[in-house]
Design a protein with these regions (language model features):
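Conserved hydrophobic beta-strand within the GNAT/NAT acetyltransferase core sheet
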Residues: 107-111, 246, 279-284
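Short, high-confidence coil segments that cap the C-terminus of an alpha-helix
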Residues: 53, 104, 217, 274-277
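Conserved donor-binding loop and adjoining core beta-sheet/short helix segment
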Residues: 6-14, 24-100, 224-225, 230-247, ...
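Acyl-donor-binding surface of acyltransferase catalytic domains
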Residues: 71-75, 83-152, 158, 299-306
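Conserved acetyl-CoA-binding loop-helix of GNAT-fold acetyltransferases
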Residues: 86-98, 251-253, 257-274, 290
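A short helix-loop-beta-strand connector motif used in the catalytic cores of GNAT acetyltransferases and
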Residues: 42-57, 61-63, 190-201, 208-221, ...
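Short amphipathic alpha-helix that is part of the acyltransferase structural core
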Residues: 1-40, 147-198
Length: 306
C-alpha cells in the first residue's frame, strides 16, 4: 500500500473523481453524496470556484481512495472515502480543518449516514451536530403517476431556449425577491453578485459546453400556453448506479401548487425506469413524501463554536 495525495485539478482529475464516486456509491449503506453532486456544482455559475485548488485527493497507487472537497458556501466541506480506507479519515479531517476555508469560523462538515466514524472524529475535534434531515428518494419499485395539468406541455429537448430557462430559474428559485426582476441579462457583469446576466451566461454556457457527465437529454421543461417556461427539472442519469439524479427542480411562483413538479418527476420516472433506473433523488421538502418518496440519504451538519 502506497498512499499519496495531490490537489484537485479540474483538467486532469474530473474523470478520476467521477469514476471514484460512482464506484463507491452505495444506496443502502450511504457514505456521502453521489457523483453528480460534485460535478454539477463545479460547472455551475453559482458556486465560488476560488478555492477548488484546496480540494484534495488521496491515492493508493493510481487508485483514488479519498476525496475532500467544498461546495457552496465554500466553508461547507464534504468527504468521500473508499471502503477499507477509513483509516485515512483522521488525516483527511485534519487537512480540512487546517487548509480548507473557515472564514469567520463558519466551516461546517456535511456528513452522512455511513460516515459515523467521521462524525466521531469531528466530535473529538470540537464539532457538534447542528441539524440533520432526510434527503428523500423515490424507489422505482413503486409507480409514479402524476399527469401534466391541462394548459401545459413538455418542451422538446431540441427546442429548449436558454433565455426562457434562465428566466424560469430566476423566478423559480425566488431570486426576484431579494435581487429584483429578471432584466439586463445581456449586460456585462463584473460585480461578483448573482444577477440575471450571470445566471443567463451560466445557462448559455451549459447549453454550449455541458459538463462531461451530464445527460441533458433527460431534462424536463414544462411550458404554459404562452410558451413561457413554468417548471424545470434537471436530470443526471448514472446507469452504473441505476441512479436517476434529479437536480435542480423549480417552478415559477404563478404556477406553483398545480402539480407541475410532480408531473416532471413522473416524466423522469417514465423515461428512466425502462433504462434500468431503480431510484431517483428528490430532497427534504415534505412535498416529496406526498407523492411517494421515502428513505434516501441522511445529512448531518457539524460545526464548531470557537
Amino acid at each position: 500500500m502506497s498512499i499519496t495525495t495531490k490537489q484537485f485539478q479540474k483538467e486532469t482529475d474530473l474523470n478520476p473523481v467521477w469514476d471514484f464516486m460512482v464506484e463507491i456509491y452505495d444506496r443502502e449503506k450511504g457514505g456521502g453524496v453521489a457523483a453528480p453532486f460534485f460535478e454539477y456544482a463545479l460547472f455551475s455559475s453559482w458556486m465560488d470556484k476560488s478555492y477548488v485548488h484546496l480540494n484534495r485527493l488521496w491515492f493508493d497507487g493510481s487508485r483514488v481512495v479519498g476525496f475532500v472537497f467544498n461546495e457552496a458556501p465554500v466553508t461547507d466541506i464534504y468527504f468521500k472515502i473508499r471502503p477499507g480506507y477509513e483509516f485515512l479519515a483522521e488525516e483527511m479531517v485534519d487537512y480540512a480543518m487546517k487548509e480548507m476555508p473557515d472564514f469567520d469560523n463558519k466551516q461546517r462538515f456535511m456528513l452522512f449516514n455511513g460516515q459515523e466514524y467521521l462524525m466521531e472524529i469531528a466530535e473529538k475535534r470540537g464539532f457538534t451536530q447542528q441539524y440533520d434531515y432526510e434527503d428523500r428518494q423515490f424507489d422505482f419499485s413503486k409507480e409514479l403517476n402524476c399527469e401534466l395539468p391541462e394548459g401545459f406541455h413538455f418542451v422538446k429537448d431540441a427546442d429548449a431556449d436558454p433565455l426562457k430557462l434562465a428566466k424560469c430559474c430566476w423566478y423559480g428559485f425566488n431570486h426576484h425577491l431579494d435581487k429584483g426582476e429578471f432584466e439586463n441579462w445581456t449586460a456585462e457583469d463584473t460585480s461578483g453578485e448573482w444577477t440575471p446576466a450571470v445566471s443567463y451566461k451560466g445557462i448559455l454556457e451549459d447549453f454550449r459546453n455541458p459538463p462531461p457527465h451530464s445527460t441533458y437529454e433527460y431534462t424536463v421543461i414544462i411550458a404554459d400556453e404562452n410558451e413561457e417556461y413554468a417548471c424545470y427539472s434537471g436530470m443526471w442519469w448514472v446507469p452504473e448506479n441505476h441512479l436517476a439524479y434529479m437536480e435542480p427542480l423549480c417552478t415559477v411562483p404563478q404556477h406553483r401548487r398545480k402539480g407541475l413538479a410532480s408531473a416532471a418527476l413522473t416524466q423522469h420516472y417514465r423515461r428512466l425506469k425502462p433504462l434500468g433506473a431503480t431510484h431517483m433523488t428528490g430532497g427534504g421538502d415534505p412535498s416529496y413524501e406526498k407523492i411517494g418518496y421515502g428513505k434516501g440519504i441522511h445529512w448531518y451538519c457539524y460545526a464548531r463554536h470557537k
